[in-house]
Amino acid sequence: FYNSASKIRVRVLSRNANDRFDEAFWARRIRYAVDYRRTVMGQDFDNCRLIFGEADGFPGLTVDRFGPILVAQVLSLGMELRKQQLFALLLQTLHAGGAQIDAIYERNDVKLRQKEGMEQGTGFVTLDGLRTDLDGHVTIRENGILYDVDYIHGQKTGFFLDQKYNRRAAAQLAQGKHVLDCFTHTGAFGLNCAAAGAASVLSVDVSEDALTTARHNAALNGLQDRVEYLCADVFDLLTKLAEQKRGAYDYIILDPPAFTKSSATVANAIRGYKEINLKAMRILPRGGYLATCSCSHFMTDDRFRAMLADAAKDAQVSLRQIEARQQGPDHPILWNVPETDYLKFYLFQIV
């Protein structure tokens, strides 16, 4: 479809000349997306990304499922014009498979909409059988951990589902470790480590609001005495700890926000990523563990690996790679759409 007000003026829906963009076409696309998640997510189908934009053939549309709640972001005019039809078809498909959906909430409070010539806004979707009077909170279970998801005020759709299996992988190294969980947001990595038997966990974030939610999540799981929370700038904290040389932590997790959202700021982002990784490597003892990631597709895997190699050289350590991971399969990577390949996640031992 075409939008003269957008920097992305043309978005391709299909390369099949025989396709007609009628209700049957959209119903088929939605069925493919839902059936794919049922297959790859299995028991985790209750909490996953149901529609991932171009990767599912819906350019500009994201839909996350948190149990009985669907949270949508509509970032292209073509999807905006069809959203009521798409929501109805998605609801129909989920109900046919036995899923109970109570509400759909739109999180269209994104500046990108203005670049598409659309207004920002949020609110419950009005469709037969859906509620519009909920308080904006839902409790989900991921990897055995309970979380209170605030889908009205939380970042993006309320919870970062793409790190689901990376959190589980990180927790497998945590038993008996003293963990420093940086950029914790609502506490997920730290809680996974605490539940896995970490000796101690310090979870750090610059946002007191995020830490309030993290503490609440810890209490939901009976882990409030196993995790300590600190409101601080991670860059400043790592600087102080690095000055102390090898410190009290033998496992550091770095899950920063995207340091770049455009190609113009990649160089600055590389410097930021290198700074936190270099300091983490200086803090960790030989034999310690590092989990590190980037969620920006502009920070390609080649750039990320080169940055890590430079940081290791400057820290005078070697990196023993344990795992290289990406986003979960509910965020599928379409090889001809590079933007869908965005999350890099590495587990290392410092040797």
Each model region followed by its residue ranges:
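Conserved class I S-adenosyl-L-methionine
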Residues: 176-185
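S-adenosyl-L-methionine
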Residues: 209-253
